[in-house]
Amino acid sequence: MPTNKFAAWLAAATVCLAGSLASGIAVGANAPAVSQKLDNATCQTCHDGKKGKLEVPKSDGEKRELHAVNTDKYGKSVHAKMECVACHKEVIDNVTPHQKVAGAPKVDCAQCHLDLWEAARKDNKAAEKPRLGIVADNVAAYKKSFHAKPNKDEPTKLNAICSDCHNVHTFDVPPRGTQERKEWHLAVPAVCGKCHEDHLEDWTGSAHGREAEKKNFKTAVCSDCHTTHDIVGSSTDKAKLSITASCGDCHKDAYESYKASYHGQVNRLGYAYTAKCADCHGSHAIEPSKDPKSRMHEKNRLKTCQKCHSGKENKPPLATAGFLSFSPHGNSHDFAKYPEIWLTTKAMIALLVGVFAFFWLHSGLWWYREYADRKSGKNVPHVMTDKLPPEFATKHVKRFGPMWRVAHLLFALSVMTLVLTGMAAFFPETSWAKTVMAAFGTPKIAGQVHRLAAYTMLGIFAIHLVVITIGIARNWKNFRFFGPDSFVPNWKDMYDMIGMFNWFIGKGPRPAIERWSYWEKFDYWAVFWGMAIIGGSGMMLAFPHVVAAYLPGWVFNIAMVVHGEEAVLAAVFLFTVHFFNNHFRPDKLPPPDVVMFTGTQSLQEFRHEHRAQYDRLVETGQLEKYLVDAPSAPFTLASKILGLVLIAFGLTLLVLIAIGFAGGGH
């Protein structure tokens, strides 16, 4: 019996031991991956590609091939010191197929780099890892890009992820300036072309692509135009504006001339509806303008222009053959190529220098003479009543009727509106120009306001001509073209000008001025010049389809130069010389002089300013015919307020123009 019990006990023990061993083996088979060897060398025993291709099933049951990892290249990459499982956290064993942890985070290049950068910043080691900061900036740009948006056809996927462009196992951007970096740069189109096959084909056959084949490392590749990470849809304004600027990185001269055109001015203001580089030259299949395949070839150019200048609803009028001789990249620096632009520009510069040299000198000397006289007590304005009859002491002289005053006010308002809207386009890269355009809404609206102001000014000018003509016709027998009441310059104006300069330098008395001084006549006739030059060129630019039907296209190049430069001359002259003559001379302080608003001038001031006319009227007994009561106090106050507002607005415009020039706008 004991023997049987012992045998039974032994059998039971054997069964238990066998069960335990079996259980241990089973547990070992399901042990966590951390207990297994998962270093890079282990991974590479399969993933180096030397044992044939590796395939894994996709969610739809199909198989996909895994890329082989070149051990040598991985060892030279930026990730060389990282373990495979640092990214592939879901892999927990070294058996094929791998057992994976359910719910493990997927590989996320962007978040990993952001976490590393944040850790470096917290540890105050950001300065030691500048490249990581650049990567973090790239990640931020990528997350806002078109590539980071859901794919239209497969919404569960993004348009592109990091590994679509970067081989994460061999990634290593060569240092700038090295031959390797140049080679890497030329390889960019091949990467982009994996998705953008049609664009790659167009680019490869283009002028840029052919240069790449010749190993011209300066040629443009995808990233030069579209950037590397901050990529947005090509139909967006941001893309259109940035790509246009990118063209200028290589084509500097062409871009500078483009910026000077109306197309470029609107573009620089931040609006993308005018023609840009790609609209004229194409985007990928770009050819030199002499190539018959080029959009800008002489046989294709008109058709290209007509894509925008189509005459359709909400589009500019149809471009005509005259457009062909317009030089979109004409400049004032190349006489051999653009002689008409060169000559026009030089003539305008000479005009500006001549006008301002004379009149700023005139103003400076005048200020000095009046200031010196006031300081010495030789000339106290508006108090010369010793010889006036008592009944005239408070009287005013009527100088301008209601029609002229209203015309002057409307003219001033239209000119200031033209300056505001025009100079915003003339200096588009200034912050104030962008603010002005935003206030109007768009350059289109600002352009409409600009033209409305121009038509108002032209209308006032036309009415003035009609009234003047009728007045001369009615008084034809007595009117003297060179008489004292005429605006036509005469010999006395020359003598007065010489006399003024003698007075400025203390070599003679102040000359007695007639009804219209020589500087007032200059102001008057300057309007005729401005209407012809600024108005004429403006009408040409406003109606190019009409002009191009009769004149060659290069007249638009001249019109652009003349319109802008002459407008600057007029604006700066008005807000410096004209303002000084009428408001800021020592005898006129404090401003404003309100004669153009009240229409009258005190008799004392009239005698001081127009002594020759005063003496003539006294001598002929006509003075009383011009005398009127002084305007009421409320009307005078309102006139002063209006005058100060206009002066303030004009000086503000002058400051904005100065900011434009100081910023290198022109």
Language-model segments: what does each one mean?
Residues A8, G52, V173, G233, ...:
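A generic signature of intrinsically disordered, low-complexity regions enriched in glycine/proline
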Residues F6, C16, G24-P402, W432, ...:
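Short sequence/structural segments immediately N-terminal
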Residues S23, V27-A29, T42, D123, ...:
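Membrane-embedded alpha-helical bundles that constitute the cytochrome b-like, heme-associated redox core
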Residues M1-L17:
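Bacterial N-terminal signal peptides that target proteins for export
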